[in-house]
């Protein structure tokens, strides 16, 4: 056409014709972009510097904990107490800002941007997407704290609200606050990180990285230094956080196994549980997102709903419905106030330090790695769909779960059928959950089913973290590629072994 060039730009913009005089400049720019993209997406290989620093830092941290346990524990307690007291308000305040920011994006034109470009097609169905999103962030905590946390809030509500323990308002606060802790703020933090990584990876065609996009605004030498520091810090923080979670999860699962088998819980039992669990989550991670995690998350989600339906059907159904309806209204009425609860009037009251501040701090720590994992699921979806699926869908499930199990615990406590509060204080969460499930028909089958769900939930929590650690340790990896299997085995085996030792 007389030297004109027909061009279709990236990101779904309108095709256009360029005159001959701009041809040379156009092709020169395209060639530069291709060279730059090739440099960014060069073959996958170990990112040696951050990997070595992160791995050795974790090793030194764990050795210190084992060699000097008492000074180490004192130091960590002092550090945590200092952070909670001085910066707790910040974690609560900024989590609230993240929620507002998320709601704003959902309602703005930005929500119409399609991840991967206008013609991108999704890799997962809505159900599979929901299942992976739910299971990668929920872990097994809600299985036990769904009963435990509402009882704590029922018996020990925050002093600055003036709520009487065991009262009707305390029950409404217990259900609504527990649901808030496990839902909206958590998923907003994960989703905002995830959508940012997804746009960088699928729309800007950058490698999947915690600091994607900084290479566009920073000099190369500064970017390399920043990348190494940030990636090493992420590897260290993620690994240590997951190790502590794995240790707690092993103890919970061991308690359930001890009950089912009648055996006394011991180090040998913990070792067997750790070995089996590690083998499962490493195996799932090495098979990749579209196989292992895709399958396990779908089955786990179905099993979640089976348990919910069973408890709802054979439990105090009408009480659960009434409490859920009233608590939902209470949550909406007091959403802003209860999203920003900190101890002001009663400085001696450690309620906020023990609950909302700890939760928000943990969510910010888990935000980037879980967001990095969720980003891989977003191709072909709009930003609005991404946020709705990763925030509102799992939050609705969490409310159903917390209301069902929390209302059950409150009902038993009020009717003196089971002293749930005393059970939690003396026997622990695991025994409390089992004790409550014993009151249902076919209790042994229900408990076995619950333990299986607990194990799968454990796998679906640690699988994404293992994959993220391997991804951060790899150079030039895109959102549609899997990290090398040897890195997944190395990080997964290391975390499982160290968690058992600690």
Regions found by a protein language model. Give the residues of each.
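N-terminal alpha-helical transmembrane segments of multi-pass membrane transport
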Residues: 27, 32-168, 313
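Helix-loop-helix connectors at the membrane interface of multi-pass transporters/channels
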Residues: 32-45, 209-223, 249-273, 302-307, ...
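Flexible loop linkers connecting adjacent transmembrane helices
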Residues: 34-41, 74-80, 107-126, 151-176, ...
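Membrane-water interface regions at transmembrane-helix termini and the short interhelical loops
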Residues: 36-43, 69-83, 102-123, 173-181, ...
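Loop-to-transmembrane helix boundary motifs in multi-pass membrane proteins
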Residues: 43-58, 219-228, 263-282, 286, ...
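Hydrophobic alpha-helical segments and their helix-loop junctions in multi-pass secondary transporters
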Residues: 57-72, 95-112, 245-255, 272, ...
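Hydrophobic, membrane-embedded alpha-helices of multi-pass small-molecule transporters
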Residues: 95-98, 127-149, 183-202, 235-246, ...
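Extracellular/periplasmic helix-exit of transmembrane alpha-helices
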Residues: 145-159, 199, 312-334, 395-427
């Amino acid at each position: 056409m007389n030297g004109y060039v027909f061009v279709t730009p990236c990101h779904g913009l309108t095709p256009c014709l360029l005159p001959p005089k701009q041809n040379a400049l156009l092709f020169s720019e395209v060639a530069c972009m291709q060279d730059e993209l090739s440099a960014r997406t060069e073959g996958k290989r170990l990112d040696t510097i951050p990997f070595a620093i992160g791995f050795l830092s974790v090793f030194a941290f764990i050795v210190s904990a084992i060699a000097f346990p008492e000074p180490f524990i004192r130091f960590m307690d002092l550090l945590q107490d200092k952070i909670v007291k001085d910066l707790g308000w910040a974690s609560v305040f900024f989590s609230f800002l993240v929620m507002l920011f998320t709601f704003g994006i959902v309602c703005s034109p930005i929500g119409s941007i399609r991840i991967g470009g206008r013609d991108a097609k999704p890799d997962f169905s809505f159900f599979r997407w929901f299942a992976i999103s739910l299971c990668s962030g929920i872990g097994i905590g809600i299985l036990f704290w769904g009963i435990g946390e509402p009882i704590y809030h029922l018996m020990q509500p925050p002093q600055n609200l003036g709520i009487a323990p065991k009262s009707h308002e305390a029950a409404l606060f217990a259900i609504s606050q527990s649901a808030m802790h496990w839902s909206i703020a958590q998923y907003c933090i994960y989703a905002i990180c995830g959508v940012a990584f997804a746009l960088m990876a699928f729309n800007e065609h950058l490698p999947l990285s915690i600091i994607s996009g900084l290479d566009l605004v920073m000099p190369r030498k500064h970017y390399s230094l920043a990348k190494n520091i940030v990636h090493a810090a992420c590897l260290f923080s993620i690994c240590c956080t997951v190790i502590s979670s794995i240790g707690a999860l092993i103890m919970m699962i061991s308690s359930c196994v001890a009950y089912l088998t009648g055996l006394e819980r011991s180090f040998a039992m913990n070792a067997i549980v750790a070995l089996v669990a590690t083998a499962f989550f490493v195996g799932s991670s090495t098979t990749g997102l579209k196989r292992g995690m895709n399958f396990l998350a779908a089955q786990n989600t179905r099993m979640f709903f089976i348990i919910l339906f069973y408890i709802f059907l054979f439990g105090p159904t009408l009480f659960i419905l009434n409490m859920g309806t009233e608590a939902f209204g209470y949550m909406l009425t007091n959403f802003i106030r209860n999203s920003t609860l900190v101890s002001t009037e009663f400085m001696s009251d450690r309620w906020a330090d023990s609950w909302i501040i700890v939760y928000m701090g943990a969510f910010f720590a888990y935000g980037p790695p879980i967001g990095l994992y969720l980003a891989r699921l977003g191709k072909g979806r709009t930003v609005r769909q991404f946020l709705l699926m990763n925030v509102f869908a799992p939050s609705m499930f969490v409310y159903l779960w917390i209301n069902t199990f929390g209302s059950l615990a409150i009902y038993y406590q009020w009717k003196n059928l089971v002293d749930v509060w005393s059970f939690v204080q003396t026997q622990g969460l695991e025994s409390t959950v089992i004790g409550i499930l014993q009151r249902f028909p076919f209790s042994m089958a229900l408990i076995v089913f619950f333990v299986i769900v607990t194990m799968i939930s454990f796998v679906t929590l640690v699988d994404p973290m293992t994959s993220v650690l391997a991804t951060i340790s790899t150079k030039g990896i895109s959102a549609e590629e899997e990290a090398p299997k040897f890195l997944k085995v190395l990080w997964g085996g290391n975390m499982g072994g160290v968690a058992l030792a600690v």
